[in-house]
Amino acid sequence: MAYCTYCSAEKLHSEKELPAIDLYKSKRISDVYNSAKRDGQQFLILSGKYGIVDANQPIAYYDHLLTAEEVEEHTELVAEQLSAIRISEVVFFMSSLKHDALVKPYLDSISRACEKLEVSLVCKEGDYQD
């Protein structure tokens, strides 16, 4: 099982690659990361650019919001990545679509990738401010 949440627009501007957990400036990401550590679960971030990213994976700064038009291609990338790490269940932490409609492409991508791989997906909505 892995806890997963989507990336954030707020990032630390850096010329060098940083571990994903340090790049994203998001209370939601930090909270889910800490919950995963507390519960002994793997933690993943769903990036609009990189797909599935481990918390400690170094990535470069980017500014990209996943769009509906990109979901099909993004889904293929995410499915390949999930398959490679052999995840059987994903718990996806997200804001409600009513609160943040920009989450929908991320939800669509992770949902389709999990469906393709027959991986269980549990979505947990929270009152996140980012």
Label every model-predicted segment:
Residues 1-130:
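Peripheral peptide segments
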